Each structure stands twice: as structure tokens, then as C-alpha cells.
Amino acid sequence: MLTSLLLATVLQAEAIGGYTAGCLKNAMALPLEGPGYQVIRTKRLRYYGHPDLIHYLQTLANQTRMAGLPDLYIADLAMAHGGPFTTGHRSHQTGLDADIWFRMANRPISKWEQDAPKEWALIDEPSYKMLPGRFGPQQLTLLRLAASKPEVARIFVNPVIKSAVCQQAGDEPWVAKLRPWVGHFSHFHVRLRCPAGSPDCEQQAPIPPGNGCGAELASWLKDKPQLPKVSSINKMPVLPSRCRN
């Protein structure tokens, strides 16, 4: 933690703008492997983040390791200067978002597997039901550790996964941070709050009161939510002036 804080101070790391229209100043790269985790899809060069995010991920990986879980697979963070991706996510622009797979690593992976890892969906898309044996104690522990940290603003999960958590741990306060969203069949998406020293970072609206296990979740499960059209995902956002200079 001290190293991250010192680097953030010396380099004046900043998250600028909003999660879906912003950039990142003086990012840190997450080492491609470390205690309790491995970075995947490294050819995308999306393993940069604000120092707070790097510290969060390394701390989480240490905690999951101590809890007896296999290594985490960490996927997209942000690009070196943040900003919009050319493909995929609309967010991940300010170095405060990270994708973590529910599938975990029981062994070091090869370079080929690192670049093209096999996805492990928890949900059968046609039926929109949980696949048997895919969401167990390890996945619940991972979500509990990931969501319990105060710097976490919210975690996006598939509504079916949120429902499973509500059934098993609905009375625990961290469950409120799990927000249902489309997709996310094989991973969850952590989003941190705006960090200190980033005056131009735009906070997202607070999550609603309650654990989110009631009528709101039921509305997501009533009809299978549809993914946004590709054209709307890839539309270039209007970036803050500091991101255009």
C-alpha cells in the first residue's frame, strides 16, 4: 500500500471525468502475475489503473489466497492513458474499473492460454439459468471479499448471479453493492469510488437503499435483459477537455 501511495503522490495520478467518458493521468501497470492472481488477455494492453485500483486488486488477491482460493484471473482494467476502448466496454476509462473472472486458476497458465483463455460461463444463456455446480462457496467468498472493501462503489454482476447471492447471503450488508447488469456471464466488474487527489473525477450516483434483492432484482429476472447494440457501445463519447489535450 505504501508503495502505491508514494507513486500516486510522486506521479500525481488522477482519474479524470466519468467512468464512461474520461481518462487517466500517470497510470500504474498491474504486474502480469503476483501472489494470488494472473492477468489474462495481456495483448490488449488493458492492465493499467489508478494506483488505488492496483492496490485494491493486489490486496484482494492476497486475501483470496489466504482464504484458500486458487489464483484469480484478472482481465480488463484500463489502457495506459485511460479513455475509451475501440471494442467492448463503454466504461473502464478512468482506471477505476476491473473485470475479475469467476473461474480461478489452479496452475500457472501458458502464454497461449494467457492471450486466449477459455471462458467459463456460470449461466446458460438460452434458458437464463445458473449452470449446475458453477456458483459455489468459492465464488461467494470471492464476491464477499471483493465487495466488502470501503473503496468499492459497486460491483456489476449478472442478475441471475445476484439472485443466487441474495438466496445465500441476502442479509449481509455487502450484497447491496452487487448491481444487476446485462451480460457478465463469466466475470464480475468492480468499480471503485473516485480517489483522493482526483478533483475532476465524477462520482457515480449512490446505490439505492436496501440490499437490492427485492422488486428491483425481480424486474431484471422477469425478462431476459438484452445487450446494447454494438453501434451504441462503440460510439465515441465526448471527453473532458483535460482528456483531449
Q: For each predicted feature, which ranges?
A:
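Extended, low-complexity, intrinsically disordered C-terminal regulatory tails
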Residues: 56-89, 156-177
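Catalytic cores and adjacent binding grooves of peptidoglycan-active enzymes
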Residues: 114-245
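A residue-level signal for beta-strand positions that form part of recognition/binding surfaces
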Residues: 4, 71, 97, 154, ...
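Extracellular/periplasmic catalytic domains that process cell-envelope and extracellular macromolecules
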Residues: 65-67, 91-96, 147-148, 181-184
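Active-site acidic/histidine clusters and adjacent loop/turn architecture
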Residues: 12-75, 135-142, 149-152
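Glycine-centered flexibility motif
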Residues: 17-24, 28-29, 83, 95, ...
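Acidic/His-rich structured neighborhood in mature extracellular/periplasmic domains
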Residues: 79-132, 190
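Hydrophobic alpha-helical targeting segments used for export or membrane insertion
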Residues: 3-12
